[in-house]
């Protein structure tokens, strides 16, 4: 039996009422002053499968978990403090850990992100700017150098590999996403940005729950869906008069906070994730952290 969940400071988007067309992109107007304090979410979530899972001890204790992902019935936890990736079975027993810090070809300096498919496990070495490709048991297969592209994050399917660039300008140009085939050959680049913008173009991305990558670009606050077939604008979030005015876009985040603009305006989307049908977007306004819930099937 489902129980109701409540998202505090949430604004639910009924796209059939609030949405309009911006070219070929759905545009949704958001007024933070009209955000609901709570809404019932029993249509989306249930507690039937919820449980506390005690994790087995690891050789190096988990001290600062920065990434937690699930795939194929396993739990993957990246510890930024120890630079280890721990993989657990669904019952919490340890499957294996990867502790391979070093300068050799099959080692890494700093794991900033990872991604799992049915066939491969990819580790992104942010400092070394390389990718370690492993099998699903963590055994090393090969190294991929990514000099010339740069990456803060990584996403993969069985057919393609994507590098996510938050805001650097590598030799390949000021683009947020670079696409490669499974053999490592460059195929495409998506979502160009202006590197001169003060507090960056965007840093928010996650999987969509259906084999795609969601990327939200500021200051336009457009959510893109990236797949092996290409890049498509999914929805544009319009904060209207509450959005940070363009004349302030050259300021960095510290300057924006010193001027008090961070409390007066919405500076963009702060978090994003999806579960297939729904896209969850978080933003800050005044003293509140609000959530936008966008239903992709109600356009």
Q: For the regions a protein language model found, what residue spans apply to each?
A:
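Surface-exposed loop and turn segments in beta-propeller and other repeat-based domains
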Residues: 45-60, 96-107, 187-203, 233-262, ...
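Beta-strand-rich domains and repeat architectures in extracellular enzymes and scaffolds
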Residues: 49-83
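Repeated scaffold domains used in trafficking and secretory/extracellular systems
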Residues: 64-67, 109-113, 149-156, 198-205, ...
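Asp-box/WD-like beta-propeller blade repeats and closely related beta-sheet repeat scaffolds
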Residues: 109-110, 125-174, 187-198
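C-terminal motif of bacterial Sec signal peptides marking the signal peptidase cleavage site
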Residues: 14-15
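Short beta-strand elements that form the blades of beta-propeller/WD-repeat-like
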Residues: 27-29, 74-79, 120-125, 159-170, ...
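Blade-loop segments of beta-propeller domains
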Residues: 56-64, 84, 93-118, 125-126
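Blade/loop signatures of beta-propeller domains
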Residues: 20-54
């Amino acid at each position: 039996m489902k129980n109701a969940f409540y998202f505090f400071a949430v604004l639910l988007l009924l796209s059939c009422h609030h949405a309009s067309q911006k070219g070929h992109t759905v545009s949704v107007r958001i007024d933070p002053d009209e955000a609901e304090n709570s809404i019932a979410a029993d249509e989306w979530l249930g507690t039937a499968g919820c449980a506390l899972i005690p994790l087995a001890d690891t050789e190096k204790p988990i001290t600062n978990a920065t990434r937690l992902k699930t795939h194929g019935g396993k739990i993957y936890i990246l510890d930024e403090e120890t630079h280890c990736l721990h993989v657990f079975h669904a019952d919490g027993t340890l499957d294996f850990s990867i502790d391979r810090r070093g300068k050799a070809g099959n080692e890494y300096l700093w794991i900033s992100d990872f991604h799992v498919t049915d066939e491969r496990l990819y580790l992104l070495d942010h400092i070394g700017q390389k990718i370690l490709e492993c099998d699903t048991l963590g055994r090393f297969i090969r190294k991929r150098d990514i000099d010339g592209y740069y990456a803060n994050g990584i996403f993969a399917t069985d057919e393609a590999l994507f590098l996510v660039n938050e805001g650097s300008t590598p030799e390949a140009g000021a683009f947020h996403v670079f696409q490669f085939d499974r053999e490592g050959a460059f195929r495409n680049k998506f979502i160009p940005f202006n590197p001169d913008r003060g507090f960056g173009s965007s840093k928010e991305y996650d999987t969509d729950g259906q084999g795609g990558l969601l990327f939200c670009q500021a200051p336009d606050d457009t959510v893109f869906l990236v797949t092996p077939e290409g890049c498509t604008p999914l929805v544009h979030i319009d904060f209207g008069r509450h959005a940070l005015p363009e004349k302030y876009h050259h300021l960095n985040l510290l300057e924006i906070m010193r001027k008090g603009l961070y409390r007066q305006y919405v500076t963009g989307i702060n978090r994003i994730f999806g579960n297939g049908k729904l896209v969850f977007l978080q933003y800050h306004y005044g003293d509140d952290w609000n959530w936008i819930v966008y239903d992709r099937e109600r356009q």
